[in-house]
UniProtKB/Swiss-Prot annotation:
Gene Ontology cellular component annotations, sorted alphabetically: sno(s)RNA-containing ribonucleoprotein complex; telomerase holoenzyme complex
Upper classification of the organism: Eukaryota, Fungi, Dikarya, Ascomycota, Taphrinomycotina
Keyword annotations: Methyltransferase, S-adenosyl-L-methionine, Transferase
Matches recorded under InterPro entries: Bin3-like (IPR039772), Bin3_C (IPR010675), BIN3_SAM-bd_dom (IPR024160), SAM-dependent_MTases_sf (IPR029063)
EC number from the UniProt entry: 2.1.1.-
The name this protein goes by in its record: Probable RNA methyltransferase C2A9.10
Keyword Isomerase: no
Gene3D superfamilies listed in its UniProt record: Vaccinia Virus protein VP39
Species of the source: Schizosaccharomyces pombe (strain 972 / ATCC 24843) (Fission yeast)
Summary of the function given for this chain in its UniProt record: Probable RNA methyltransferase.
Positions of the Bin3-type SAM domain: 23-258
């Protein structure tokens, strides 16, 4: 997998993260959105967002999926590290943000991390036992499980560049097929200028944008065809230091209303 052509940057969150323990994009969303929900995080990278949803936001189950096996290994190590640092749970129904730094990094280095399988449940949803990570190419991955919420944060560009127009259509169709009725897609698409930058930076994509007929401003139409309807969008908080580079992208919240006309593409 050369030149991180799937967006599988191994230092992504250290490069882009701001000052907050919680990912600022999650802070934009309603507190109750993930509570007791089954969640799929497509392109989970090192599992930072997945682990926060499974712990602080009280999801019943979270599956983090990434095409890069090295990142999945990092995600499992990150989960072990994060859960080892969480302090005593005052309220069994939730883990609050300040508990995440309860045990200092120095103590973890001195006494080592606690393997996830040996840790007691830290909240009502059984964290850290309510989260799994899997190496898979989403377009070729099969699942019998459906999800209440699916996240696609800064991954649509990479799906599109690697799999072209047919791939992005299939991507949205497959997301719809994996969502429960009234399930929610949280989409953070990259803009067309980001495609052009990637094409200049990664040689395998040098000619790709000019061969694409679909651009990100057409995604809403494709998602409507897949049975997903835009509920609202969240504009970037450009003056908030917590957001750092994440401030440049809008998130779109879609809800599954029914069976889309491109559902058949998910089985081809």
């Amino acid at each position: 997998m050369s030149n991180f052509q799937h967006g599988n940057y191994h230092s992504y969150y250290s490069m882009r993260g701001g000052t907050s323990i919680i990912d600022p994009r999650l802070k934009c969303l309603p507190d109750s959105l993930f509570y007791e929900a089954s969640v799929l995080d497509i392109g989970c990278n090192n599992g930072t967002v997945s682990a926060q949803i499974a712990s602080i936001f009280g999801a019943s189950f979270v599956l983090g999926l990434d095409i890069d096996h090295v990142l999945i290994q990092k995600a499992r190590k990150h989960l072990e590290f994060v859960s080892s640092r969480i302090g005593p749970v005052r309220n069994p129904g939730s883990i609050v943000e300040d508990q995440f730094n309860y045990y200092p990094i120095s103590s973890i280095k001195k006494f080592s991390r606690i393997p996830v399988q040996l840790q007691p449940p830290l909240n009502k949803q059984n964290f850290p036992h309510n989260i799994e990570f899997e190496t898979a190419d989403f377009l070729r991955w099969e699942s019998k499980r459906k999800f209440k919420i699916i996240l696609a944060l800064s991954v649509s560009k990479w799906v599109h560049l690697n799999n072209h127009d047919e791939g992005i259509i299939k991507f949205f169709g497959k997301i719809s097929s994996l969502l429960e009725t009234n399930g929610v897609l949280i989409l953070e698409p990259q803009g067309w200028d980001s495609y052009l930058k990637a094409a200049k930076k990664i040689s395998v994509f040098n000619q790709t944008p000019e061969n694409l007929k679909i651009q990100p401003d057409a995604f809403e139409h494709l998602l409507n065809q897949a049975g997903l309807v835009l509920e609202y969008s969240i504009e970037p908080q450009v003056n908030n230091s917590e957001y750092k580079n994440f401030a440049k992208r809008t998130m779109y919240i879609y809800k599954k209303k029914g069976i889309g006309i491109i559902k058949l593409l998910t089985s081809t």
